[in-house]
From Swiss-Prot:
InterPro entries: AcMNPV_Orf112. This is Uncharacterized 10.5 kDa protein in HE65-PK2 intergenic region. It comes from Autographa californica nuclear polyhedrosis virus. Pfam families: DUF2661 (PF10860).
Amino acid sequence: MTKRQFALLFVWHHDNQFVCNTDEYPFWHNIEYHARRYKCIVLYCVENDGSLQLPVCKNINLINYKKAYPHYYGNCVDSIVKRAGKN
């Protein structure tokens, strides 16, 4: 019998910061909590990521959408700019 693996996928987009964590919105704490039991994948896109500091955590795989899928990211941004009439 094949053992099935289960992973949770979290998606994050923000202009300037990585997954935020506040008393009202404990997004990062939720990911850390679930990572104790499940493999977690965070697909993130931070628009201004020049000085971004990423955490290193066991059982959490971080994927930068802009770097992993540059073609899709570029097309997405171009499409938004065209729709907004900014081109």
